[in-house]
Amino acid sequence: MEKKEETKQPSGSFSEVWDKRGQETDAANDFRKKIEMEITEARPGYAVGEIVVTPWHTNIEGIVHGCVLYSLSDTVGGTAAMTGRDYAVPTVDGTIHYLKAGKNTSKIIARAQEIQNGYAFSVCECKIYDDKETLLASATMTYYHLRKR
């Protein structure tokens, strides 16, 4: 699988480069707020997000729930796919591989890179790490370009 070359990040703070659509989507995203997810960086084709881990995010063994990792990868991947574009990107498909247990970590960080941007679909690879940069999961997410008619 050929990776798309990463674009240079525009200068300025995250809030300066976060486009109007991203701000509106972020303000309306109640689910993201409920699971305490923060998007910390976004530009067309790339995004970073994190969750500060609390007992609410873990199972009885103290391991971050798989659904939390999946939700983080889906949201961060979707942010990468939609930032700078004038259409929504609902998820069509997602595959995640859980590689290590997310245990004894203060936060989880997801980095998503768009690897394909076609007319109708975007595909993003998302890697999720713990606070020590240990790779916990790898996901491939596909999004449909829901254009206005």
Give short role names for the model-derived ranges.
Residues 1-149:
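Terminal targeting signals and extreme-terminal segments of soluble enzymes
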